[in-house]
Amino acid sequence: MVSLIDQNQLDSFIEKNPSWIIDNKTIKKEFKFDNFIDAFGFMSKVALLSEKMDHHPDWQNTYNKVTIELTTHDMGGITTNDIKLAESIDQLINT
């Protein structure tokens, strides 16, 4: 079951993943790549992952940069699904 995370859980996530920032009721991260093709390839991987998890990011792409914001709109904030997706996205980068 999806639930909003509390401040302690959010602080713990940010401590372990300092490249993600809290922005209002979202967690946000900017990814930089060598070029547009690499950025778009990353977005394709995230799209497949998101579809599999049935949880989708808000994102923006400008040339070699991809900004991802995660929140659960119908819950009104950051949930366990957002944390799981953020961790899974980071694993894509680290593999």
Regions found by a protein language model. Name each.
Residues K52-N61, T67-T72:
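Mid-chain, well-packed structural core segment of small domains
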Residues S44-A47, E87:
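Solvent-exposed alpha-helix faces
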Residues I68-L92:
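C-terminal structural segments of small proteins and small subunits
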Residues I22, A47-P57, N94-T95:
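Short arginine-rich
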Residues M1-D34:
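N-terminal first-folded block
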Residues K29-N35, I68-H73:
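Alpha-helical scaffold segments that form or flank carboxylate-/histidine-based iron centers
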Residues I37-M43:
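Short amphipathic alpha-helices within nucleic acid-binding modules
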